[in-house]
Every structure is written in structure tokens, then in C-alpha cells.
Amino acid sequence: VGSINDAREEIINLCKIKKIHQIPIVDNKGNLIGIEVLNELISNKKKSNKVILMVGGLGTRLHPLTEKTPKPMLEVGKKPILLTIVEKFAEYGYSDIVMCVNHKADIIRDYFGDGAKFGVNIEYVLEDKRMGTAGALSLINEKITEPFFVMNGDLLTNVNFQHLHDFHTSNLSMATMCVRDYDFEIPYGVVNIKNTKILSIDEKPLHKFFVNAGIYIFDPEVLQFIPKDQFYDMPTLFNKLINENLKIISFPIREYWIDIGRTEELEKANNEFNKEF
């Protein structure tokens, strides 16, 4: 049995070790979400689901590095962050890519072109103003008929995109958000008080949360909830879907993931790249 958190290469190796041609994949609760076929994993058959990459950010926190270079084009592991993202999707057969560009769009277009030299097809949507993490989706003219991925262009991850897709579809979800564990320790003793009475004292309590990992998969029907030609971010979209009583779920990421928003994360990603990729 394979896990939803196993990478493609791990599943291939497991099939070879066990000398099997098919392997069931289960989620973290042991529920069956799909079956992987060894021949399909090795052949890397191309899939028709679109991948929409949000790459128009200003990268303000990474100045001066982003004064001449858009953040997704900063190098990690001696190649642009965005190239690694494209390669990871292509590894799972997702080669139909749309890049939503704004800040220094020409640099991204000049590097990737139509994507042919990278084995993918790339189209571009130009934001002529800031549209937010969801607003740019309203600019896509082509009719989308299948579940599609959306990902921020400043992330590096080893998430299994095929398992994310299967998890989304098997749960009949309208929208699925990838989430990460985040722990926060308060460095003091926290005093719980009612009026002036001390009820309890917790010494340096550890709070655990799930945070948005910046990777999503949506059913096409979600697009009707995004207003045209205006700023609209992902939290607003998800809250709208919640208010509409639509099924939206989370997909916990256990694999490697890093958000490269500051110089500290950029340095960390460079130090870890060869080990993780």
C-alpha cells in the first residue's frame, strides 16, 4: 500500500521492490483514494488538467534582489524557482500551464517562451493591475472543463500532484487547499484569568495550526464566484465558497515545502535544494 504523501519515485521503487504492477494509495486515515499503475508512472502520460501559476508578485521583501528579477525567477539550486515548479508538474504529466504575469513579465516570457524546450505548453495571462491571488483567474478566456491546479510561483515543494488531484476528485470537492502544520510557542507563562481570579497558568504553551500552503485544486464551477477584473484573494474566495455551503477540503502536505518570501528562506532553500530535489 502506498501513502498519499509518497512521491512518484517512491511509489515506483515500492512497486519494483514488491514486484507488483499496481498499488493502492490511501490517505492519512487509511481511506482508498486511487490506484497507481506502474506502467503509467514510468511512461509519464500527459494529462489535460491545467496548471495556473501565480507569478506576478512584486517580491518586496526580497529587495534588492527583485529590483531587476521577478521573485519566481530568483535562482535556487542554480536555476529559477519557477523552472523547478514547472519541472515538478511535468514530472506528474501536467504540462498544460498558464502563467499569470505582472511584475517584469517580459523576463519570464523571454525565459520560458511557449514552454516547448521544457517539454510543456505555456500560455500567459497579463495582469495590467494587481488582481490578488484569485482575481487573475477571471482573466483566463479559455473555457476550463476539468479540475485545475493553482499554485503560487514562489514555493518549492515535493508534494505529489497526482495524489492531490486524486484526493480532490475522490472526495467530490469543489475546492481543495493544501495546508501545512505550523507550531508557535509563546515564550512566557500564559495566565488564564476571569475577572481578577487566576484560573490556571500554562508555561510556554505550544499552539498548533494549519496554514495555507499556497497550492490549490479547483473544479471549474468555482470560477463563477470570482468577480471580473478586480482584486480578489484566495481567503476571500474560500470564505465565499464556505458561505455558499459548497464542499471545500484541506490536503495536508507532509513532504518538503518552503515559501521563499524573505532572504532567510531563499538562503535556506539553496542550502536544502540538492538534498530535496
List each model region and its residues.
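The conserved cystathionine-beta-synthase
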Residues: 1-20, 26-27
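Short beta->alpha transition motifs characteristic of CBS
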Residues: 20-24, 31-45
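A conserved hydrophobic position in a structured secondary element of the catalytic/binding core
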Residues: 36, 103, 151, 193, ...
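N-terminal glycine-rich phosphate-binding loop and ensuing alpha1 helix
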Residues: 44-108
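Active-site metal-binding loops of divalent metal-dependent hydrolases
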Residues: 58, 154-155
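Conserved N-terminal catalytic core of the sugar/cofactor nucleotidyltransferase
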Residues: 79-152, 158, 163, 228
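Catalytic-core segments of class I nucleotidyltransferases/pyrophosphorylases
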Residues: 148-149, 156, 162-169, 182-185, ...
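A short, conserved acidic/glycine-rich loop-to-beta-strand motif
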Residues: 171-181
